[in-house]
């Protein structure tokens, strides 16, 4: 059973009206002083752990008593979490810290359904909580009285520069303007059933300018990165995505790329470094670079719809503010682009709050994604299937003892539907994480009304001729593993590849819409140029022209017959995403041949 501590925070309001104080977050002109006093409720003689799994804090805010519930974020670090920095002579130093007993928590305010909290309890209480729609920050005061803390609103932190701060992404990944029904999107239980949690394994990279900004204090940098990751993890829980920190790399001696104010240049260089260096020594899904360099006119930039891509599953973030919440929201925004989320359009809504995916930072940083963001994200996940984020960590991989109520099925649990207040699973006893009497299951695509679905019930639909449907066995709540026909099997006058049937007509449709078809063979001869758009593959950064027999394995060309168009050799090219618009692997390029690594090869030898 989780041992809960009750800590009473007594508020003593010092005379501060008209005064200000300099905190880590900046100059604050209106604040309260609070004194946390810990009152344990552990059994007599019990050994108190350094950082409890769950805690409650009772305090007064604006004269009203509130109870803050906190639970240790057990999904913050992966089992194989590592940290890398460099000696003055450039030697790589990688360690694997013990992070089981960490001090980072998520939480909520009792009787406030819209409340959130992200708190570090390492040295006092530091972080933020939302109460009755308003964001409060809390941090220890550096006074001789070590128990003194300041509580204040974000709006009371003086801003050095009031000019709007923008994200550098200027184009949507896809146009969803016709789909304004997204503004009425409702997340149903059935929708959730077929959209389980995804898991993003994140590496944070800190540049040399950040090290200099922090006077070379690597421990200070690490603490800040943990706090940022804790908040990003909390934000994405509401998108059914777990973000786990699997690695931290600090460029302590020198930058491994040239970090320039030009965001496009820096993002491209960082992506190439991730592909050729970081991925070869650290398994992960996504990498974000934090820099203290002032980026020209923007505070962040990322590739859109690129999660799991070796180069483009990346973003860059300017360390724009000393307030962790602000930088964490920027990071969540840029990672959102990687997950296919566009900037919010005029009809998107977060209720009464600002939205994370606004093109510019809102006057108060938001922790909410809009209905459009949810639609964009899950449209990308469903239709483009970024496979790297599907792998759910096994219960035995969880680095800390299991915690009932964290919505993650762990060793010894039959189900986990969250806290008793939030559980909506009629099959699961939220207090014990055991199935209720008479229930066979509490989750899974083959679980209906707490019973195993009948044998033969379809649980995963066929996506193409190469991907047969899966059916329930009648003996398990889980749908059998997704299998597909062997690569190279005939389908739609083409050949199957990883469960899909990649024909050029479909690829043209995805790029340009209806009434667009595969172009004549003569158009593909342009791929022999080896110029910025016409090539077959890249080697060491150089674009390699197609050999005559390989021209249909380079840039895709389409014939546009849509109204008002008469383009017989239409192609797509973007500096931000050079790979988009290339013929997909496995596409038929001649009778009995398919595209593989920019070559048109015999289907019998391709797989």
From Swiss-Prot:
Motif (D/ECD-tripeptide) positions are: 465-467
Subcellular compartments: Secreted
- Residue ranges of the Peptidase M12B domain? 198-393
Q: Which residues are glycosylated?
A: 371, 566
* Positions annotated to bind Zn(2+): 333, 337, 343
Which domain of life does this protein belong to?
Eukaryota
Asked if the record carries the keyword Ion transport, the reply is no
A biological process term (GO) from this entry:
venom-mediated disruption of extracellular matrix in another organism
Q: Which residues form the propeptide?
A: 21-189
Disulfide linkages recorded for this protein, renumbered to the chain, are: 308-388, 348-372, 350-355, 404-433, 415-428, 417-423, 427-450, 441-447, 446-472, 459-479, 491-501, 508-558, 523-569, 536-546, 553-595, 589-600
Region ranges (Inhibits platelet aggregation): 459-472
- InterPro entries named among the record's database cross-references: ADAM_Cys-rich, Disintegrin_CS, Disintegrin_dom, Disintegrin_dom_sf, MetalloPept_cat_dom_sf, Peptidase_M12B, Peptidase_M12B_N, Reprolysin_adamalysin
Which residue intervals define the domain Disintegrin in the entry?
401-487
Question: Where does tissue-level expression of this protein occur?
Answer: Expressed by the venom gland.
- Relate the protein's function as given in its record: Is implied in permanent muscle damage by attacking the collagen scaffold and other important basement membrane proteins of muscle, and by preventing muscle regeneration through disrupting the functions of satellite cells. Displays collagenolytic activity, fibrinogenolytic activity (on both Aalpha and Bbeta, but not gamma chains) and inhibits CRP-XL-induced platelet aggregation. In vivo, induces hemorrhage and fluctuations in muscle size by intramuscular injection into mice. Also induces apoptosis in endothelial cells, without triggering cell detachment.
**Per its record, how is this protein called by name?**
Zinc metalloproteinase-disintegrin-like VAP2A
